[in-house]
């Protein structure tokens, strides 16, 4: 299960970020401005954000097996269609539809994790799966540059799209929505997953709770604080996923090949950061038995550190030193990812797909805005201006985690 979810994470990030490596070539071929490129990057994010709540509902209603099979097939085909864009409007439309397809991926994966892993392992499981996604962004510059050198930028989308189609077919035949539906899972394993002793009856959710309580979810201050804090991660990460290759090539005047060698380093650091954050939040939880500080402490430290390092990254004139600062910054940003998703699962009760979809919707909307703002600031102010904004957003995230978020308070709790 963890292997398949990790591969899914890898595919989602490969397909959403491959355009960042192709962007300089696409921009030159079609004559796109920086603001137009930012809009193309953001088209995916806005669609991805809009599709989160429907994706969460589909996941909680129909299960991860069916939902992931359908959506991975769909977005993989849309990845291939990207190669047939003929201009700005068609590229925006294709990326928007592609984003709708990917929107159900993480709500469905989160639903699957909730059924298949105990509470004490949720941080690490989130860390492993999300680190696979981050590791994918490390591979993209290397593989995409090699493909582009041989066959051009359009071939990138054909190759990566085919990978997702293969995964969807395998997932449908090997996955089950719940561990009790899998004959390979014995009673002891099932009891461990459900945090109970062998022979103890499984606690069923009351009938009234089986209907998704959207009013309670959407009026939970705690849920909205988590969602807003998650914006610190997405706002910063969109720079690394979409703008960093162009920034290195145009601001530091390096070649496509050198960019392909340097860009993976901050992205690999991000993958390590996700794993570290997942391990750290579970380590603190197992020692303290408190969700409150196991989630908050990691996020506060990571966001404060990343905010402080973002500006030195911008002011370094040496591309290698810049990449080192960016690697440290992305490591810290990414440490907040696993505890953020674990917190969404913690407060969700039995509705993790729906709650996580709201959090991801808000976060991806913020990331989409950042892609446009970054391009506009570069075009009309300077390459340095957007780094101040990113640093400020991450500082705000740290303050939310420090003073307003309580991972132990359920969204349905109004006491």
PLM region descriptions:
Residues 19-20, 218-277, 334-341, 345:
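Extracytoplasmic gate region of multi-pass secondary transporters
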Residues 31, 63, 84-90, 101, ...:
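Helix-breaking motifs and short loop linkers at transmembrane-helix boundaries and internal kinks
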Residues 50-89:
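Conserved MFS/SLC helix-loop-helix module at the cytosolic interface between two early adjacent transmembrane helices
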Residues 66-80, 292-311:
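Structural signature of the two symmetry-related core transmembrane helices
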Residues 94-134:
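Cytoplasmic helix-loop-helix junction between adjacent transmembrane helices
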Residues 133-182:
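Helix-loop-helix hairpin linking two adjacent transmembrane segments in secondary transporters
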Residues 149-162, 255, 294-297, 376-393:
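A membrane-interface helix-boundary motif in multi-pass transporters
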Residues 345-380:
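A late C-terminal transmembrane helix in Major Facilitator Superfamily
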